[in-house]
Amino acid sequence: MQVRKRRGLLDVSTAVLVGILAGFLGVVLAASGVLSFGKEASSKGDSSLETVLALSFEGTTEGVVPFGKDVVLTASQDVAADGEYSLKVENRTSPWDGVEIDLTGKVKSGADYLLSFQVYQSSDAPQLFNVVARTEDEKGERYDVILDKVVVSDHWKEILVPFSPTFEGTPAKYSLIIVASKNTNFNFYLDKVQVLAPKESGPKVIYETSFENGVGDWQPRGDVNIEASSEVAHSGKSSLFISNRQKGWQGAQINLKGILKTGKTYAFEAWVYQNSGQDQTIIMTMQRKYSSDASTQYEWIKSATVPSGQWVQLSGTYTIPAGVTVEDLTLYFESQNPTLEFYVDDVKIVDTTSAEIKIEMEPEKEIPALKEVLKDYFKVGVALPSKVFLNPKDIELITKHFNSITAENEMKPESLLAGIENGKLKFRFETADKYIQFVEENGMVIRGHTLVWHNQTPDWFFKDENGNLLSKEAMTERLKEYIHTVVGHFKGKVYAWDVVNEAVDPNQPDGLRRSTWYQIMGPDYIELAFKFAREADPDAKLFYNDYNTFEPRKRDIIYNLVKDLKEKGLIDGIGMQCHISLATDIKQIEEAIKKFSTIPGIEIHITELDMSVYRDSSSNYPEAPRTALIEQAHKMMQLFEIFKKYSNVITNVTFWGLKDDYSWRATRRNDWPLIFDKDHQAKLAYWAIVAPEVLPPLPKESRISEGEAVVVGMMDDSYLMSKPIEILDEEGNVKATIRAVWKDSTIYIYGEVQDKTKKPAEDGVAIFINPNNERTPYLQPDDTYAVLWTNWKTEVNREDVQVKKFVGPGFRRYSFEMSITIPGVEFKKDSYIGFDAAVIDDGKWYSWSDTTNSQKTNTMNYGTLKLEGIMVATAKYGTPVIDGEIDEIWNTTEEIETKAVAMGSLDKNATAKVRVLWDENYLYVLAIVKDPVLNKDNSNPWEQDSVEIFIDENNHKTGYYEDDDAQFRVNYMNEQTFGTGGSPARFKTAVKLIEGGYIVEAAIKWKTIKPTPNTVIGFNIQVNDANEKGQRVGIISWSDPTNNSWRDPSKFGNLRLIK
């Protein structure tokens, strides 16, 4: 390659040449995201690729056009990646101004392509670049962001964007637009633009069945029935019917070991059907075991919500790596509802590899080293499997970014114990010693994980030669021998140990897990473990390590445990694992750190950090959604702001995995939980830590209820039915709280704004509405905005829009109310609209969703509102007697029913009819539960036949529990248990068994409010249904079909207290 370097450096190591073409020196692709170029790509010779478009800009701008009315494109000799010229992009005035590459007529819908280009910018700071696919077809015009990539200054960056166009019919336009959407105050350069495609070869169908000739090679999975049924069929006359299921994993399966080959990617398709009367989740899963796997793995290919009475397609891809030895590959269908009967039809497996473009990338040398960015705060670590020591790319990434490591599994008891001989433990340290060698050679430190754990410890370790459990005395001696030997072997080499791991169970009376350790030794094993570790290496730092340390009940138990050990001089710190997700409340993590930090002399290590891109356990994405990756980055930013804030006590932050495909979470589904992707490339989550200012805005989501209001500056009751929307300032303080409702063609908005200054012409609020919810880099005709200044003047973008307004006076704050009526628009229930709101304070904008504050020019970063009707009920004033009898006063209040199904079905599982009363001291609940089979055998109280009550006193409907939120549970034997915020002091119950079920009467003491008539609180009630085997088979509540009320009050219904 000819390289002309004028300013900065050209990265020529971003891609490794991999021979996928014979006798042709051209463009070569490998396994991830950037190309490396030899000669110009062409279709000559025996090539696997062909060139769709190639642009070099040598004295010309041909092949591209400006996107944006003021953009200027020139062929420039300022700087070039290859040859003498590059394309200079300047005079951008909108964030979505850039360069458009027209591919109309050059690409096909559904085909795979690669856009490769090199980009350069010299702004002296990292900058975010985007690629946007523009489509105009029979469905209309749309703009989809298909790439977010951060590029450092003064460096030619080679970028590869896989894309697959999707359009209906012959499109009027299909193009790709390259922009830098965060800033317009710099110019950038493009060079060596190419679009490539694999040559036509056609996917190959390797397996297909429609069950017209019976079940074939399919087998029952577990004790179930499978048969070819003519009851329903997606095609033909038959489908596969699975019945008599009792457990979630049970279903139908087929052995594919002899059918699927290594080094190939397969597309799986199947159609599924169920007629339970409710939506159900059905999953297509691969059970696999390679010789390199320690145990069998279960990986979701696709999960889908299947409406009752409809056929739904499950489709996804599955890759078998080259070079592995396959021991088991079994495809099966399952459901999280353990008793669901369902049908499968038209199963197809396609070998896609022949049409696949492969890419391989090197770690990015030019980006900042994480350990250098954070060196003034704490050590930065990573958990590693031993295989990384054989991979030069892994080693490069590790040594660049980290100064601490943890052996992922190789220092756990099952890895170190080789057996027992003559009563003495035998050990194997060979693999673990490789970690010590690595840190010594690279100037790092290592954390030891873990000494005492209920998992990954051999069963024989707890038994004598006759297979009986050891006595407490013998177990104590074995514990001492193990810890003295292991810690002694690594004395002076391992700087910190997770001595005891996951010993706390908040559902136990004393808060401790009933492990084999506890069974033999009681709680004493914890203190003894620390005592023996301190004896073996007095200089090593000793930690108690656990997950979900931020959940309030578990947090408090850990606090008391560690405080006691610290006072005895036996412990140095707390290990907070932080296996979290997008649903995790970051505020709770800070509260836990804050509480733990009050223990004198304590250290905190974040020991196992990863963040799933999911909010639940059932979703399964074929590719990580862009919005999820952006949200992951924003949460990572918040998390590290907290870590740095408490760096006086936090001394190590360790990621549990080097890159996404190495994560322990990538078993049933891809979670994409780490800061580097499978190709060693930095994700947005990495930049959230290093340069958070480059992150794309996080489009917000909320929902509002149907309702009307009179615009007179008062918050009508209808507003209380909608979830509040908060606008924050740079420090995270609430700048404004607004509520909105909708009716016909009008949106009503009421808000309260914090504003310390009084500048009527420079203070105000702006409301933006995108009725069709289409995201475009310009305003469409229906897009509407209205700016209301505190001097009552308004600015609107459309003359036909009707705006009613009110601005209320106030000291250091003010209220406002608006109604915006848009002619020609009719809002409908369960539809979505684009929406944003901004506060203007002294001329400065603070926005809810689009933090670039460019809402007047485009809708790309508007938030989304779902127009819905939240469950609403009333509770009458009155005080019943809590005795299990139905007093007459209960008949004075409204009856509601549990109909929101999270598991099971309305006709087969337990439900309840519910009434609610209130007075100044208590909220009262009556539930008449229909449940003919009562069981409480399960040790988990939420899996017993029981009723759960959830309240949100301030009705904030946050995605996490605030201090006023609480969860209470009582089973049919009147045994109480509690989730976050609940306690026996606030909960009175009486239960009476009746024919076909039971009655629950409960009183919940108010905690943070003094209720008055017309107060609206958040409320939900849930019925848990166990079968005769003690398995939970039903979860049906009043308002939340997601089964997330235990951690997320946002889907509670609204309960109005009336006289």
From Swiss-Prot:
Optimum temperature is 90 degrees Celsius. Thermostable. Keywords: Carbohydrate metabolism, Glycosidase, Hydrolase, Polysaccharide degradation, Repeat, Signal, Xylan degradation. Optimum pH is 6.2. The active site is at E502 (proton donor), E608 (nucleophile). One of its GO terms (molecular function) is carbohydrate binding. It catalyses: Endohydrolysis of (1->4)-beta-D-xylosidic linkages in xylans. Residues 700-870, 871-1059 form the CBM-cenC domain. Residues 47-199 are annotated as: A-1. SMART domains: Glyco_10 (SM00633). Pfam families: CBM9_1, CBM_4_9, Glyco_hydro_10. Residues 364-692 form the GH10 domain. Residues 1-30 form the signal peptide. Residues 200-354 are annotated as: A-2. GO terms for biological process: xylan catabolic process. InterPro entries: Carb-bd_dom_fam9 (IPR010502), CenC_carb-bd (IPR003305), Galactose-bd-like_sf (IPR008979), GH10 (IPR044846), GH10_AS (IPR031158), GH10_dom (IPR001000), Glycoside_hydrolase_SF (IPR017853). Its EC number is 3.2.1.8. Belongs to the glycosyl hydrolase 10 (cellulase F) family. The C-terminal CBM-CenC domains mediate the binding of XynA to microcrystalline cellulose. CBM-CenC 2 alone can also promote cellulose binding. This is Endo-1,4-beta-xylanase A. It comes from Thermotoga maritima (strain ATCC 43589 / DSM 3109 / JCM 10099 / NBRC 100826 / MSB8). The gene is xynA.
